[in-house]
């Protein structure tokens, strides 16, 4: 059915598609945001939601006594009261110690996840300083490139990571976060009455420079404004308030804090008064132990981790009954795996979602029981968002059921790539549309489906083969723990699909069996035609497969090195 709006657009009530403009509109209720001209930082906004809106986790409780963060390795924790005091203390200390540190200056952060990282993020954002965190295990050349891109005036590191900054000359130098001086800045006795938000921060000001994964080239610095972060936080906050199931939420923080989803999960938890458990180096059994010990109710996962949960015998060893939901993203989740997961964990919901660093995290997700059974879909686009499906060849906007490149527009879309006007213009057009590079389609009910990355399709003769489709089939094999499919150069076909397989321990699965297993389930041009067995599939911190690494390994013939 079509609805005629005041501006004469015709919007289908079921799909949200406007046939005149080619735009898909979110069917979720529009969300009111603070006036754009109101001075407000993302840090102040999140803390105001915690203190003023009485989220479910804080109902009838002393907010300051609630636990915000727990380090699963050491058992150390940080309460919300301590968080507020330390943010105030650090903000004051930084302004006193570095009087020239000004709003819009950039602070580069190179540190493993710890209880102090959220304090540092909030303190810096509250005084208008742009936070730019990077992967602490990155190489010196990678770190040097990120410093060059973000142009910081100051850096925060640890004794273990500071050596990677030796080649970088910063105006205000580098602060060691494990030094006695820094620790003293966190615990000033005179900061209890100080308002850390005295510095005027506009919502249009830059808040963070987060680095893209680099799966399609060298990493870029994604510039997100306070408005971007406020809009993203408002959506997740409102969704949780609408959730009819009210329980104490404890999240397992398996994502690094420098990654956009870890970054946004940190802010979201603050706005809701939730508890986060920091997991150190990721190991499956360590995750199970943490779930059992801290009664974890939810955690972010990638499809390969869902596969591991389905197939692992370790799940019988630990009490995982506290789990209520898993937020799944990073890649499409196959229907077969989702159904097998629900058979094994009938009381755990899979909340599927889609997002990018460039969209400040989630831009679409499932919500509520009816949507969560839409296996294979990443849900509906978020509140206040618009989308297009664009034919890559013609530029034509496509209706439901047709596959093309997903474009997104809304208040969460990045300002651009730092210092890279060309890439910014190529990615976000003059009308504010973000070209995601993902091949997708909407069904007739406004549910979004990810087919594959536009640049990752395998060109077999005149056909295009989506690697994700083959990976989902491979994951359904009981002898396969993990799998990835990449293009392999071929003189006759141009490219052929090559599968990298991680076998179940003790399995004798061979190349011929894999090829036959897939061939029985696909049209001939989609067949896997080459197989290599390896110990682990290389992925980025969000769980996305590093296909370029695998392609290089395949071409070099070095599969045995993994």
From Swiss-Prot:
Cellular location(s): Peroxisome
Q: Which cofactor does it need?
A: Mg(2+)
One Pfam family per UniProt: AMP-binding_C
| Catalytic activity reported | (9S,13S,15Z)-12-oxophyto-10,15-dienoate + ATP + CoA = (10Z,15Z)-12-oxophytodienoyl-CoA + AMP + diphosphate; hexadecanoate + ATP + CoA = hexadecanoyl-CoA + AMP + diphosphate; (9Z)-octadecenoate + ATP + CoA = (9Z)-octadecenoyl-CoA + AMP + diphosphate; octadecanoate + ATP + CoA = octadecanoyl-CoA + AMP + diphosphate
- The listed location of motif Microbody targeting signal is 560-562
EC class (word): ligase
The UniProt annotation puts the region (SBD2) at 353-417
Which annotated residues bind CoA? 281, 461-462
Instruction: Show the segment(s) annotated as SBD1.
Output: 283-352
What are the BP-aspect GO terms?
jasmonic acid biosynthetic process; oxylipin biosynthetic process
Describe its function. Contributes to jasmonic acid biosynthesis by initiating the beta-oxidative chain shortening of its precursors. Converts 12-oxo-phytodienoic acid (OPDA) into OPDA-CoA. Follows a two-step reaction mechanism, wherein the carboxylate substrate first undergoes adenylation by ATP, followed by a thioesterification in the presence of CoA to yield the final CoA thioester.
Q: This chain belongs to which protein, by name?
A: 4-coumarate--CoA ligase-like 9
Task: Name its species.
Answer: Arabidopsis thaliana
List the taxonomic lineage: Eukaryota, Viridiplantae, Streptophyta, Embryophyta, Tracheophyta
Give me the gene this protein comes from.
4CLL9
């Amino acid at each position: 059915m079509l609805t005629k709006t005041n501006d004469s657009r015709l919007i289908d009530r079921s799909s949200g598609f406007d046939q005149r403009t080619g735009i898909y509109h979110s069917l979720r209720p529009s969300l009111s945001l603070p006036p754009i001209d109101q001075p407000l930082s993302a840090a102040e906004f999140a803390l105001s939601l915690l203190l003023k809106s009485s989220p479910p986790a804080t109902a009838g409780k002393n907010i300051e006594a609630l636990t915000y963060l727990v380090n699963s390795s050491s058992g150390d924790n940080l309460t919300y009261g301590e968080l507020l005091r330390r943010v105030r203390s650090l903000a004051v200390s930084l302004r006193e110690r570095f009087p020239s540190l000004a709003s819009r200056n950039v602070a580069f952060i190179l540190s493993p996840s710890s209880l102090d990282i959220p304090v540092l993020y909030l303190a810096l954002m509250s005084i208008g300083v742009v936070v730019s965190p990077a992967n602490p295990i990155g190489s010196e050349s990678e770190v040097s490139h990120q410093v060059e891109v973000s142009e910081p005036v100051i850096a925060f590191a640890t004794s273990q990571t500071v050596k990677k900054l030796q080649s970088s000359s910063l105006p205000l130098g580098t602060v060691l976060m494990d030094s006695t001086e820094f620790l003293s800045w966190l615990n000033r006795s005179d900061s209890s009455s100080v308002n850390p938000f005295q510095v005027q921060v506009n919502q249009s000001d830059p808040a963070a420079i987060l680095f893209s994964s680099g799966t399609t080239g060298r990493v870029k610095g994604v510039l997100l404004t306070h408005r971007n972060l406020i809009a993203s936080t408002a959506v997740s906050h409102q969704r949780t308030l609408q959730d009819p199931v009210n329980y104490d939420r404890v999240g397992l923080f398996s994502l690094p804090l420098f990654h956009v989803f870890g970054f946004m999960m940190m802010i979201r938890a603050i706005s809701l008064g939730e508890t986060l458990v920091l997991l150190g180096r990721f190991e499956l059994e360590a995750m199970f132990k943490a779930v059992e010990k801290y009664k974890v109710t939810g955690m972010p996962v990638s499809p390969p981790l869902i596969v591991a949960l389905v197939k692992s015998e370790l799940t019988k060893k630990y009490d995982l009954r506290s789990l209520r939901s898993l937020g799944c993203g990073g890649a499409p989740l196959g229907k077969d795996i989702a159904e097998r997961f629900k058979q094994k964990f009938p009381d755990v919901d899979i909340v599927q979602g889609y997002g990018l660093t460039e969209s400040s995290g989630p831009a679409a997700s499932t919500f509520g029981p009816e949507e969560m059974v839409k296996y294979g879909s990443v849900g509906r686009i978020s509140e206040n968002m618009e989308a297009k499906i664009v034919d890559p060849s013609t530029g034509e906007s496509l209706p439901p059921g047709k596959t093309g490149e997903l474009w997104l527009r809304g208040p969460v879309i990045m300002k651009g790539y730092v210092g890279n006007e060309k890439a910014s213009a190529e990615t976000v057009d003059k009308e504010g549309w973000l070209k995601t590079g993902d091949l997708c389609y909407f069904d007739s009910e406004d549910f979004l489906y990810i087919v594959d990355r536009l640049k990752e399709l395998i060109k077999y003769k005149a056909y295009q083969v989506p690697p994700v489709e083959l990976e989902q089939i491979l994951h359904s094999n009981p002898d396969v723990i993990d799998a990835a499919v990449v293009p392999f150069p071929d003189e006759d076909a141009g490219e052929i699909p090559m599968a990298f397989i991680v076998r179940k321990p003790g399995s004798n699965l061979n190349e011929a069996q894999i090829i036959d297993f897939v061939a029985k389930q696909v049209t001939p041009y989609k067949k896997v035609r080459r197989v290599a067995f390896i110990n682990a599939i290389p992925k980025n911190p969000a769980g996305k497969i590093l296909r370029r690494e695998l392609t290089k390994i395949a071409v070099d013939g070095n599969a045995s090195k993994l």
